[in-house]
Amino acid sequence: MEQTYVMVKPDGVERGLIGEIVTRIEKKGLKIVAGKLMQIDRELAEKHYAEHIGKSFFEDLIGFITSGPVFAMVLEGDDAIATARRMMGKTNPLEADPGTIRADYAVHTNRNVIHGSDSPESAKREIQLFFAPQEILSYQKAIDTWI
């Protein structure tokens, strides 16, 4: 089973969207194998967004992601990365397909409610950044025996 990292950003947490987003994830068939509400500090934010160091928007990005709590998750399922990304929609909510999380809830590219890994490599890196191995659980959902 493939794993991916997904995070409800501060704007999503502050607007009370964690439950709605988790419901969508579970209804889609992805399994949450780790999850926690946390405050990201600058050091972790810089590691997470290392590829953007030196870009004009970097400081705003760090300021936003450290401005409030996030809900970090590890999801598991067949094709979990692509499935989660389709559910999220395009980065710019104005370009996101109707019915996606960003189209339905995001108001601006810089405040787009949710983050998700874009490749197996980034998923592995992000999961290791945000979760210790013992925080990631292995379990079988009741429905799995029927699939």
UniProtKB/Swiss-Prot annotation:
Taxonomically, which superkingdom? Bacteria
| Gene Ontology CC, one term | cytoplasm
> Where does this protein hold ATP?
9, 57, 85, 91, 102, 112
Q: From the record, what ranges are coiled-coil?
A: none
Q: Known InterPro entries for this protein?
A: NDK-like_dom, NDK-like_dom_sf, Nucleoside_diP_kinase, Nucleoside_diP_kinase_AS
Chief place of localization:
cytoplasm
Q: Where in the cell is it found?
A: Cytoplasm
Which keywords annotate this record?
ATP-binding, Cytoplasm, Kinase, Magnesium, Metal-binding, Nucleotide metabolism, Nucleotide-binding, Phosphoprotein, Transferase
Cofactors (names): Mg(2+)
Query: One MF term in GO for this entry?
Result: ATP binding
Q: Which residues form the active site?
A: 115 (pros-phosphohistidine intermediate)
Any matching Pfam family: NDK
The text of the family note is: Belongs to the NDK family.
Q: Which HAMAP family match?
A: NDP_kinase
Subunit note: Homotetramer.
Briefly state the protein's biological role.
Major role in the synthesis of nucleoside triphosphates other than ATP. The ATP gamma phosphate is transferred to the NDP beta phosphate via a ping-pong mechanism, using a phosphorylated active-site intermediate.
Q: What is this protein called?
A: Nucleoside diphosphate kinase
Identify the gene encoding this protein: ndk
